[in-house]
Amino acid sequence: GYVLATPIQVLDSVTPFLNNGFLVKPTLIKEVVDGEGRVVTPFQVTYRDALPDTPEIDRVPIDGWVIDVVRRGMEKVVQDGTGKDLDRIEGVTFAGKSGTAEYCDNVAQKKNLCQFGAWPEHAWFLGYAPADKPEIAVVAFVYNGGEGSLVAGPVAQQVLQAYFELKQVDVAHGQ
């Protein structure tokens, strides 16, 4: 089959669980700065309406206990599940979900990879941190990557780690 969801769509599907039921518009940059290091365009969290027919911004109708169960499950993935072998981030707990998706698209067919019982696999990992109060969420997708936790997991972990390392640099420089 074909991958019908983009990484941004996969990320978007989990945001209500990380933001107490609210949809948050994904953002790819923190801020825009000029040559002198001054912030020209700051980052602003933008909420999206789960029910656009009403005048206010609505939450996705998910019970709080469901949000808690999903988040605890994603924490357990990294603590003692498929993501337990990922490197830790010093001083930060993170959570996530790995995914491995068999596929047989036109590229795999041309390479004769679509063998019944041994189809090629895409690697996925969605991670966020800190686990208790998320600031950042990341999706890693590796085409024909194999096992999600082994291939895409380390990619997501490295992005999360880089975020927190850069955050420490900002703090050290008073930003």
Summary of predicted features, one role per range:
Residues G1-E56, R71-V171:
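Active-site beta-strand/loop architecture of penicillin-binding DD-peptidases
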Residues D68:
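A short, flexible N-terminal coil/short beta segment enriched in small residues
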Residues G174-Q175:
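Short, solvent-exposed mixed-charge patches
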